[in-house]
Regions:
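Short acidic/glycine-rich loop or secondary-structure boundary segments that cap or lie
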Residues: 50-53, 94-96, 108-111, 135-138
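Gly/Ser/Thr-rich active-site loops/lids in small-molecule metabolic enzymes
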Residues: 59-67, 116-136
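ATP/nucleoside-binding phosphotransfer catalytic cores, i.e., glycine-rich phosphate-binding loops
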Residues: 88-89, 94, 119, 129-200
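Catalytic core of DAGKc-family lipid kinases
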Residues: 1-98
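Glycine-rich phosphate/pyrophosphate-binding beta-alpha loops
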Residues: 46, 50, 101-115
Length: 200
């Protein structure tokens, strides 16, 4: 995607010539993936606010970071947190959340880190629950994202897991690596270890 989250995490250069030189070294790394049925994600899957942003942004003509920020502002003014039931490796949690991100790698893209300690090859997904927060704390939430300290926010809860079931009240968008889709109000996610080799 335009945020290059996975590429940035893997250290793949954004410069085309440098990226080609890296490819020509032919050094590969194995990474995990998250699976929802037959669909895979390699970076982050999300439900809630970020999925609503992805859904809206997909239909926007104004792209790039500025367009994305504009979409965030438009969505956040009307967005309401939802109630979720999560089953993470057999333990059940009930949460009212602003959004839930299931992270294979630490960042969305553009160096915004939602799960600072996530790893693409540890055989685990990090379930990041962003609780309802006062709007006046939004600047601090953004600071945490770009300072790699989201896990230190009192409004963020991170639970590692291999098998995850998320049930939400009503219908709401879901995204897999930024691509919006509708998979119903209950999704089952599991990690598949060492699923893909990437030349980086």
């Amino acid at each position: 995607g335009s945020g290059n989250g996975l590429a940035l995490y893997l250290g793949i250069p954004m410069n085309e010539s440098a990226a080609l030189r890296r490819i020509n070294r032919f050094e590969s790394v194995g990474i995990d993936c998250g699976k929802i049925g037959e669909r895979c994600f390699f970076n982050i899957a999300g439900i809630g606010f970020d999925a609503s942003v992805s859904d809206r942004f997909a239909s926007e003509t104004f792209r790039g970071p500025v367009g994305y920020l504009r979409t965030i502002i438009n969505v956040i003014s009307k967005y309401k947190p939802k109630k979720y039931i999560l089953d993470i490796d057999g333990k059940v949690y009930e949460r009212e959340a602003f959004m839930i991100s299931v992270a294979n790698s630490p960042q969305y893209g553009n160096n915004a880190y939602i799960a600072p300690n996530a790893s693409i090859n540890d055989g685990v997904l990090d379930v990041c629950i962003v609780h309802k927060f006062p709007l006046y704390t939004l600047p601090m939430m953004i600071f945490h994202l770009f300072n790699k300290t989201a896990d230190q926010s009192e409004y963020v809860e991170i639970i590692p897991g291999k098998k995850i079931c998320i049930e939400q009240e009503g219908k709401a968008p879901l995204h897999l690596d930024g691509e919006p889709m509708d998979l119903g109000n209950k999704i089952d996610i599991e990690v598949q270890g060492n699923a893909l080799k990437i030349i980086c």
